[in-house]
Regions:
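Short helix-capping/linker segments at secondary-structure and domain boundaries
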Residues: 101-105, 139-146, 247-255, 284
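Short, polar/flexible loop-turn hinges at active-site or ligand-entry regions and domain interfaces
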Residues: 52-53, 145-148, 173
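A generic secondary-structure signal for well-formed alpha-helical elements
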Residues: 64, 71, 99-102, 142, ...
Length: 326
């Protein structure tokens, strides 16, 4: 029996943070042996919000290094840049004929991005990036797509496009299902709902222990816990949300200590620093190896792109045949 196929992707914005790990990478790593996986470096998608392409290649390499250091296995799953597989653009063009402007304007994720990034004039590419995302997924006939709740509307658009193409031209594409990430996101160090490089509120997977300590020292905690012995409210404390992920075996002790006033914020942050640093340490070690062996990283990318290209060519020819385009 053939394994179901998964298409996962990230926009390359440089080095990854622990929010990327919790929200995506951890899930990808756990799925790589169970499914047939393809991992996409979505470099075209970067251009939807930033036209400056000077750093895209280097950011792609940095992200790939983090993928490898965190535990993705290139022997199992190809890793490749979207821009190097020309079939992405061709399928995107075809799919753009199947998606209406009204449907894209109703997409809540795009609405949120426009609001959060204060975008006044939305580009055609930004409005239509769920169509490009549909091409990314369906070019490899993805059955499942690991996403957070905020990306589910995009998967629904992908399903609609697959259905419309199949009805119009004949059966080619599956209708992919979202595979929700259990621990979808970590809040930023400033208390913002999302950890984001653009907001400067991250702990990187490449941060050393001292850097993590410095960053966590400034992290937002319960404003009512002014003195060490004041009882705290873990449910409103940012640091406690990190403990839930990185200190699972101590979580009851930490919660009890906070509520009773026995555990002060400084000690709580130091404990969190220690546990996050211990988690990151093996990733840092592997990252150092790949930084010193960049030719190996580039070879992994080339191999992944060659493997992805073979699959993409087969799919696009099938599409052309169904559409009688030759």
């Amino acid at each position: 029996m053939n394994k179901k196929r998964i298409l996962s992707g990230m926009r390359p914005t440089g080095k990854l943070h622990i929010g990327h790990y919790v929200g995506a990478l951890e899930n990808w790593i756990s799925l790589q042996h169970e499914y047939d996986n393809f991992h996409l470096i979505a470099d075209y998608h970067v251009l939807t919000t930033n036209l400056n392409s000077d750093s895209i290649y280097q950011d792609s390499i940095e992200m790939l290094i983090d993928w490898l250091a965190a535990g993705l296995d290139p022997k199992i799953s190809p890793m490749f840049r979207q821009s190097q597989i020309k079939e992405h653009a061709e399928l995107h063009l075809i799919f753009s004929m199947l998606a209406t402007v009204n449907r894209l304007e109703r997409n809540p994720t795009v609405k949120d991005q426009i609001r959060d990034l204060h975008i006044e004039n939305v580009s055609y590419g930004h409005l239509g990036y769920p169509v490009l995302q549909a091409a990314d997924i369906l070019l490899y006939k993805g059955d499942l797509v690991p996403v957070g709740e905020d990306q589910v509307p995009h998967i629904e658009i992908t399903r609609e496009i697959a259905r419309k193409f199949n009805n119009q031209y004949g059966e080619v594409f599956p209708e992919p299902e979202p595979k929700l990430t259990a621990f979808a996101r970590l809040p930023g160090l400033d208390g913002d709902a999302k950890m984001s490089k653009s907001l400067g509120n991250t702990i990187l997977l490449s941060d050393d222990a001292e850097t993590i300590k410095t960053k966590l020292r400034k992290a937002v905690t319960d404003p009512l816990k002014v003195r060490k012995n004041d009882p705290g409210r873990p449910e409103v404390c940012l640091v406690f949300s990190y403990h839930k992920k990185f200190s699972p075996s101590e979580i009851l002790e930490i919660e009890t200590g906070c509520r009773s006033g026995a555990l002060g914020c400084v000690d709580c942050k130091l404990k969190c620093t220690s546990n996050i640093s211990s988690f990151i340490a093996p990733i840092l070690e592997k990252r150092k190896y790949y930084e010193e062996h960049l030719d190996e990283v580039k070879d992994i990318l080339t191999d992944g792109e060659n493997r992805a290209q073979k699959v993409a060519k087969i799919t696009i020819q099938e599409v052309r045949d169904k559409m009688r385009l030759g």
